[in-house]
Design a protein with these regions (language model features):
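Structured interaction patches on ligand/partner-binding surfaces of diverse proteins
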Residues: 1, 8, 64-87, 214
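Structural motif
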Residues: 9-27
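Solvent-exposed strand-loop boundary residues in beta-sheet-rich modules
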Residues: 20, 34-36, 63-65
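Short, acidic Ser/Thr/Gly-rich low-complexity loop/linker segments typical of extracellular
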Residues: 32-46
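Collagenous Gly-X-Y triple-helix signature in extracellular proteins
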Residues: 84-303
């Protein structure tokens, strides 16, 4: 244990926890804003500290001299805190710890499935890429919902792709209502994903888009641009996600039945359509006001 040397009224109890047995024996340090440090060792998947209250601290998990996790927290008067510091691929905070340590390739394989909660209900997500464009995004894992949401949705209320995905009703929904439905720990670790997407209206011009939750561009799925602007690949740098190199993985279902599902790429040859994936897993496009399946994506990347 890492109890403080002195007694303070209203001490704050902090418990570093992990669900991974491999974290036992690793060192946990806590450093105050004034530079005082406490140290302990993970045992039985936890390490406890009693700290002076009303201060800001930094907690770190260290293995072999390498800091695998670090975060700041505030310790209130008489407060009890549990802080997850371990490498657990099945929890949002554990995944964040893994990518912060640069160990995503050791813990994840493309095709792994992880369960997250949406409005308190379990939903299965596929690992569609590990370390996607690492030179751009750093250490990361990309997740996409295995099945589409139960409710199909329009990309826009009318048949237009003007402004691209960034101006769509779908974007507003996914970054708003849907994001807010995710468990709070997951919301806290999702990375704002920045990429170059088409502006629509039959243009090959691109715009920078930033989203917490997003849909893939056509190239992410097919490794080609059949109906999207080729600049999403040649200028924007999009790459195919490894999960979708297997064509069978491109077929998705909503409510147990295979469905057409939306992509974020505007259809480059007209102004009314967005790219999509048909029930056979092939590239296609549909009018923006049609209701189709939605398979949300997000990235968890290192700080």
């Amino acid at each position: 244990m890492g109890f403080a040397d002195d007694f303070y009224y209203g001490q704050c109890k902090v418990v570093a926890v992990t669900t991974a047995s491999a974290d036992n024996g690793k060192t946990v340090t806590i450093t105050s804003s004034g530079g005082r440090t406490w140290s302990g060792t993970m045992a039985s998947k936890k390490c406890e500290f009693m700290l002076p209250p009303r201060d800001k601290y930094t907690i770190a998990l260290i293995s072999g001299g390498v800091t695998q996790f670090s975060t700041d927290f505030f310790c209130g008067y008489g407060e009890y805190l549990e802080i997850e510091v371990g490498m657990n691929k099945n929890t949002a905070l554990g995944i964040k710890n893994i990518v912060n340590a640069g160990l995503e390739a050791d813990y994840f394989q493309v095709g792994d499935q992880i369960t997250f909660k949406e409005n308190g209900v379990d939903a299965t997500y596929d690992v569609v890429e590990v370390a996607y464009r690492q030179g751009v995004y750093g250490h990361n894992v990309v997740f996409q919902r295995h099945a589409c949401l139960n409710t199909t949705r329009q990309m826009n209320a009318s048949n237009t792709n003007a402004g691209g995905y960034n101006s769509s009703l779908m974007k507003t929904y996914l970054d708003g209502e849907f994001f807010n439905s995710l468990e709070s720990d997951l919301q806290d670790v999702i990375t704002e994903y920045s990429y170059q997407g088409s502006v629509g209206s039959q243009s090959t011009n691109l715009q920078t888009e930033e989203h917490k939750v997003f849909l893939p561009v056509e190239y992410n799925i097919f490794g080609a641009t059949s109906y999207a602007a080729g600049t999403e690949r040649t200028t924007g740098g999009a790459e195919q996600w490894s999960y979708y190199a297997t064509s069978a993985n491109r077929v998705k279902a909503a409510n147990g039945a295979s469905c057409v599902w939306w992509l974020s790429s505007p259809y480059v040859s007209d102004s009314a359509t967005f790219c999509s994936v048909n029930t056979s897993g092939a590239a296609t496009g549909d009018n923006a006001s049609n209701s189709h399946g939605v398979a949300p994506c997000f990235m968890i990347a290192a700080d």
